[in-house]
């Protein structure tokens, strides 16, 4: 039986062998295909592993500036790859490292890897910039760090990556879009957008290859068709179709979805060169700021008069019903420790009115920046800018102001109309965040309601502010209260009720870009390595003082020496700029504030902008007694058109190559910010400056100077009155 089965089996296989060979070819092909699949799968798995190792190794590069940065960096170890976008600092899983001195920003939920890459101390071989004889290595290293950061940000970045142009907004970037300004849910929408991006989507992003500006692009300019016309502020004005049926301005900053590529028109009656400083303190050209509601406002107030073609500002007529100098002296009499221009150098003034307070302090070497509230439909902030006073426009509602913690020596509110005790006191807690320990909060008002007074007293007591004085100034008839923030954390432990509570240790007090306000108290810095732990030196000594918490002192000193030499040898004499007509200046990529510091002796003020994706050096800029602000240049800036006489951009475009959808929109924004007759000075790679020059020519700017050496260059251009 067994023998028969064996014979049958042999016969069966013999028949199979005689069948066509096609089936064997197919089986062989399937086996080979399977082996190829296994090979490629193992290859891809290896690549992913290598990528992870490479990202984790960035921690070796990071070098925090202060211990505040260091401790927060440790907290951020648990951050996830899929976390991105604009952060709510209250969430432990979303909050990253503190940005005390100059580590990378943590305004958004970025990963620890990004923190490491964007640090300025990473070095690699790149062409050495030689635009001038004096070259600073810090500038190179900062640029290299930004380049490395951009490379990685496309794989992990959220709204600051390659699709970072105004994600917060709702219109189409031309003033024609559809808007549903549901302001109460703005921050919720931001979170939803952040969650939509998966790990797979992030990993698909790659570094943009090729030039920053599209060489094939042809620009056909047109005027913006917006509700606010010649005063268009893209992220503040509500210009969508639906928005026009609602409020005039957004409750919170909300930018167009698409890059703004239209040009803001000139005022209805044209624009003439502004009155030069210091004459502009007392008068400006009315046509440059003409506004229907401003015309009605002028008729009701005596501190501003229409005199022919000018608006004049009588020195003896102020909102203080008397001499503002008396008001300042009254404050010093109540609190002798306040020494204007010495221990008090940097002041934030809430709201814009007649700017007499700002002007009087300027004469005492006090630099005051005014917060023009978005509800100011009279546009008094624009009047202040035209007069030459530091001003920016923002809402004061639910998001933090774009400043680091503990940087203002004094905050002033004179009849500013802010209800500090409302919404759980979060507005006052925001002032507590940005006020320097031991700093002063001055509150002046004409009519105090008993209910408001009681609520304010309870709130200030709950956050342990000490009321130093409460008197009525006779000349102005204003009740003046002066509070002082604690200098240590001991007093917080003595509170019977821990409400508001102390903020969590992992919450970053310096995170400010699209970050909601918190109803908690941040602890006072106590270690010498933390920024804000000690009061700065008196002015002007603080300008050249490098605090203990600054770990890159040598680089900061090199930066200062570099820009002093550059400004004195080139900028003041070699560019053809008439500095007698320059007052409002912006440094679009401030590092240590060296460029602004070099202009201190000139009759100018400088807004030092620290991009939110770059190392956070803004606390040090304030420590020096200079002004600054956080900003993302993929979005329009928070100010009126024609605000600045000079824009300075040092390697701005090369650092934003992989962050902004359309870098040309930054040039459009520069055109919006600059006054006719104003200047831009751009230092960057030659491959960037050449197409940039063509874009400026298409905007009918006058190219006054170009300079190139090796791969680096400089471009100096002046804006004209041309509009399409």
UniProtKB/Swiss-Prot annotation:
Pfam families named in the record = Methyltransf_29 (PF03141)
List of glycosylated residues? 305, 316, 568
Which residue ranges run through the membrane?
23-43
Q: Where is this region: Disordered?
A: 63-211
Taken from the record's topology, the Cytoplasmic segments are 1-22
Family annotation (CDD domains): AdoMet_MTases
Enzyme Commission (EC) number: 2.1.1.-
UniProt GO BP: methylation
List the membrane topology term(s).
Single-pass type II membrane protein
Residue stretches of biased makeup (Basic and acidic residues): 71-98, 126-140
Q: Which UniProt keywords apply?
A: Glycoprotein, Golgi apparatus, Membrane, Methyltransferase, Signal-anchor, Transferase, Transmembrane, Transmembrane helix
Q: Name one GO cellular component term.
A: Golgi membrane
Query: Where's it found, cell-wise?
Result: Golgi apparatus membrane
Gene3D superfamilies in the record: Vaccinia Virus protein VP39
Which SUPFAM superfamilies has this protein been placed in? Answer: S-adenosyl-L-methionine-dependent methyltransferases
Q: Where is this protein primarily located? A: Golgi
Q: Which residues lie on this side of the membrane: Lumenal?
A: 44-724
Q: What class of enzyme is it?
A: transferase
Q: Report which superkingdom the organism of origin falls in.
A: Eukaryota
Q: What family does the Swiss-Prot or TrEMBL record give for this protein?
A: Belongs to the methyltransferase superfamily.
What name is this protein filed under?
Probable methyltransferase PMT28
Q: Which organism is it from?
A: Arabidopsis thaliana (Mouse-ear cress)
- Species classification: Eukaryota, Viridiplantae, Streptophyta, Embryophyta, Tracheophyta
């Amino acid at each position: 039986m067994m023998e028969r089965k064996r014979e049958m089996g042999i016969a069966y296989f013999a028949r199979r062998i005689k069948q066509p060979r096609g089936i064997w070819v197919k089986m062989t092909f399937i086996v080979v295909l399977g082996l190829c699949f296994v090979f490629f799968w193992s290859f891809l798995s290896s690549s992913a592993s290598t990528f992870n190792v490479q990202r984790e190794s960035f921690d070796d590069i990071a070098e925090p500036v202060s211990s505040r940065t260091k401790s927060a960096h440790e907290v951020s170890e648990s951050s996830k790859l899929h976390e991105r976008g604009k952060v709510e600092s209250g969430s432990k899983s979303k909050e990253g490292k503190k940005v005390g001195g100059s580590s990378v920003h943590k305004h958004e939920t970025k990963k620890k890897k990004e923190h490491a890459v964007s640090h300025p101390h990473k070095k690699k071989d790149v062409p050495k910039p030689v635009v001038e004889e004096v070259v600073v290595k810090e500038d190179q290293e900062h640029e290299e760090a930004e380049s490395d950061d951009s490379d990685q940000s496309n794989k992990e970045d959220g709204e600051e990556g390659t699709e970072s142009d105004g994600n917060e907004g709702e219109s189409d970037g031309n003033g024609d879009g559809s808007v549903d300004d549901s302001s109460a849910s703005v921050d919720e929408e931001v979170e939803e957008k952040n969650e939509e991006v998966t790990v797979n989507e992030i990993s698909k992003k790659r570094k943009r290859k090729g030039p920053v500006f599209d060489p094939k692009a042809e620009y056909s300019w047109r005027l913006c068709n917006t509700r606010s016309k010649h005063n268009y502020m893209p992220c503040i004005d509500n210009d969508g179709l639906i928005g026009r049926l609602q409020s005039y301005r957004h409750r919170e900053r909300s930018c167009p979805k698409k890059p703004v590529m239209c040009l803001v028109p000139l005022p209805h009656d044209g624009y003439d060169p502004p009155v030069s400083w210091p004459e502009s303190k007392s008068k400006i050209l009315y046509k440059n700021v003409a506004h229907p509601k401003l015309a009605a406002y002028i008729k009701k107030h005596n501190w501003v008069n229409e005199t022919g073609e000018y608006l004049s500002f009588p020195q003896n007529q102020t909102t203080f019903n008397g001499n503002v100098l008396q008001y300042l002296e009254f404050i010093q009499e109540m609190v002798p420790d306040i020494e204007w221009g010495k221990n008090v150098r940097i002041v934030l003034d809430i709201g814009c009115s007649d700017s007499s307070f700002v002007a009087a302090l300027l004469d005492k070497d006090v630099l005051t920046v005014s917060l023009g509230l978005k509800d100011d439909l009279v546009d008094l902030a624009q009047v202040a800018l035209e007069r030459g006073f530091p001003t920016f426009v923002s809402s004061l509602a639910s998001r933090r102001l774009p400043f680091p913690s503990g940087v203002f020596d004094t905050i002033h509110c004179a009849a500013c109309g802010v209800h500090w005790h409302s919404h759980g006191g979060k507005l006052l807690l925001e002032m507590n965040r940005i006020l320097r320990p031991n700093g002063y909060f001055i509150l002046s008002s004409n009519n105090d309601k008993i209910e408001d007074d009681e609520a304010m007293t309870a709130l200030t007591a709950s956050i342990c502010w000490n009321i130093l004085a409460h008197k009525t100034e006779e000349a102005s008839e204003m009740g003046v209260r002066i509070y002082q923030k604690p200098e240590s954390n001991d007093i917080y432990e003595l509170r019977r009720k821990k409400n508001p509570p102390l903020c969590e240790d992992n919450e970053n007090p310096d995170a400010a870009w699209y970050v909601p306000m918190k109803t908690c108290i941040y602890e006072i810095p106590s270690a010498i390595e933390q920024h804000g732990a000690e009061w700065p030196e008196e002015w002007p000594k603080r300008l050249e003082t490098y605090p203990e918490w600054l770990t890159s002192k040598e680089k900061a000193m090199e930066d200062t020496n570099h820009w002093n030499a550059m400004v004195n040898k080139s900028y003041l004499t070699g560019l053809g700029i008439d500095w007698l007509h320059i007052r409002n200046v912006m440094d679009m990529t401030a590092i240590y504030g060296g460029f602004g510091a070099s202009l201190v002796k000139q009759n100018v003020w400088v807004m030092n902008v620290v991009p939110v994706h770059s190392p956070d050096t803004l606390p040090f800029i304030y420590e020096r007694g200079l002004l600054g602000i956080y900003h993302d240049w993929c979005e329009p800036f928070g100010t009126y058109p024609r605000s600045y006489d000079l824009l300075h951009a040092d390697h701005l475009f090369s650092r934003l190559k992989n962050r902004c959808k359309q870098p040309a929109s930054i040039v459009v924004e520069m055109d919006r910010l600059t006054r006719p007759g104003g200047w831009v000075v751009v230092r960057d790679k030659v491959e960037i400056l050449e197409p940039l020059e063509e874009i400026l020519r298409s905007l009918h700017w006058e190219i006054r100077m170009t300079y190139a050496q090796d791969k680096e260059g400089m471009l100096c251009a002046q804006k004209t009155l041309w509009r399409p």
